[in-house]
C-alpha cells in the first residue's frame, strides 16, 4: 500500500480505489492511497450512459480510478464519481499508481538493508526526493541517468546514498530514445577523402561534446552516404545536439568546398 502523505483527498483529485461492497443504490470503496479510507460511490455517479444494474459496472475486489466529488473533513466521509473520470485520466492515474508501488518496493528494500522501516525510509529520503523531483520514481530515473549526484542534490542523508544507488540500478531501467539519418558528404578535390573525414569528425565531435549522455555512431553505408545514429534519454537532448552538429558540419563543409546534406529517418 502506498505511503499516505495526507489524511484526506481533495475534491477533484483522482484516486485509486478497491471496490468493497456493491448495493443497488451505490458502492463502498476503500481508497488505496489513503490507508484504506472508505469512500461512497453513489449509483448516480457510476456511469454516464444507461446501465441495467450497478453490478454490471463495478464488482467487489475490482480496482478502479474515481474522482473525489465531496469531502466531509469533520466526519472523514468521502464521496466519489466513476463517470467523471475520462479514459485518459484513468490510464494516467493507473500508470502513476503502478510507478508509485514499484518505487516504494525499492525504497523498502533499501530500508531493510539499513534495518529501517518503510515509514522511516520515507521520512528520511522519500519525502525529500518527492519534493525535489515531484515523484519518487522520477527521482529514481534521474539517479539512473546522473548517479549519486541526483540523490545528494535532493538532500538525501549520506548513509542512504549507496544503498539507494545499488537498488535503483538493479531495479530501474530508463529507456533511451534514438534519432537516425543519413549524411551525404562529397568532395571531388584531390584530397577529397581527407576533407570528407574532417567534416564527419566535426559532426561526431560536436555531438559527443554536447552531452555525456549521448551515444553516437557514424559509419559509411556506401560513399558519399554515412549513417548517423544518436541515442540518449530524451529527445530534447538529441535534437539540440543534432542541430548544433549539423550547423558546425555545414560550416566546415562550406569552408572546405564539400557538398553536405542530412536526410532524417522517419520514426
UniProtKB/Swiss-Prot annotation:
Role, per record: eIF-2 functions in the early steps of protein synthesis by forming a ternary complex with GTP and initiator tRNA.
HAMAP family attached to this UniProt entry: eIF_2_alpha (MF_00231)
Signal peptide: none
Subunit and interaction comment: Heterotrimer composed of an alpha, a beta and a gamma chain.
Domain S1 motif: 12-83
Keywords attached to this entry: Initiation factor, Protein biosynthesis, RNA-binding
Family named by the database record: Belongs to the eIF-2-alpha family.
SUPFAM superfamilies: eIF-2-alpha, C-terminal domain (SSF110993), eIF2alpha middle domain-like (SSF116742), Nucleic acid-binding proteins (SSF50249)
PROSITE patterns associated with the record: S1
PANTHER family cross-referenced by the UniProt entry: EUKARYOTIC TRANSLATION INITIATION FACTOR 2 SUBUNIT 1
InterPro entries in UniProt: NA-bd_OB-fold, S1_domain, S1_IF2_alpha, TIF2_asu_arc, TIF2_asu_C, TIF2_asu_middle_sf, TIF_2_asu
GO molecular function: ribosome binding; RNA binding; translation initiation factor activity
Name of the featured protein: Translation initiation factor 2 subunit alpha
